[in-house]
């Protein structure tokens, strides 16, 4: 029985492709909250967050407006003297994707940013961390790659069509040029033949007139 349970747990671990951690915490003002994650080189780290502010009239938390509330996220490599590798400023809700370039402990810091009275308002931050292999890209990345691939295929198709049209135009130009040269050649030979006929005719007429004048004793 125990062996069966262990096998079931092991099978579940194999099925799950990534580690997911979801939680929320409360803060006030622009308090910076940091979390530590051990990431190996090539690990894909994804964070999803949503900030809500406390409404006294509703006596509950509500979504913060995008115009007057934002969230700043920093990722630092603690093993490299807190080297800053990500600095992202977003709206009250959003996501972040990071690919670890080195193995070691990383510090993920979340800091709400607000203006006016919201800077002192009670804030609830919902956070979800997902850690997986870089081979398991997120759906947005795959969709973007598919879109770009489709655009490249369309461009290649258009380029091929343009090349075919250019080849057709070159073939038509070559045909027209050959036809023009043939017409010009025929016209030139026709002129030459006409000149020859005219010269022969003139010569024959001159000779005939000479004989005529001799008979008439004009010459």
From Swiss-Prot:
Main localization category: endoplasmic reticulum
| Keyword set, alphabetical order | Endoplasmic reticulum, ER-Golgi transport, Membrane, Protein transport, Signal, Transmembrane, Transmembrane helix, Transport
**Cytoplasmic side stretches:** 208-219
This entry carries the following GO cellular component terms, namely: COPII-coated ER to Golgi transport vesicle; endoplasmic reticulum; endoplasmic reticulum membrane; endoplasmic reticulum-Golgi intermediate compartment; Golgi apparatus; Golgi-associated vesicle; mitochondrion
Signal sequence segment: 1-22
Where are the membrane-spanning stretches?
Answer: 187-207
Per UniProt, residues of the GOLD domain are: 32-131
* Lipid bilayer topology: Single-pass type I membrane protein
Write down the InterPro entries for this protein, in alphabetical order. Emp24-like, GOLD_dom
Where in or outside the cell it occurs: the entry states: Endoplasmic reticulum membrane
Q: Which residues lie on this side of the membrane: Lumenal?
A: 23-186
Q: Which Pfam families match?
A: EMP24_GP25L
BP GO terms, sorted:
endoplasmic reticulum to Golgi vesicle-mediated transport; Golgi organization; intracellular protein transport; protein retention in ER lumen; vesicle budding from membrane
Q: What else is known?
A: Present with 20700 molecules/cell in log phase SD medium.
Query: What function does the entry list?
Result: Involved in vesicular protein trafficking.
Family from the record: Belongs to the EMP24/GP25L family.
Q: How does the record describe its quaternary structure?
A: Associates with EMP24, ERV25 and ERP2.
Protein name stated in the entry: Protein ERP1
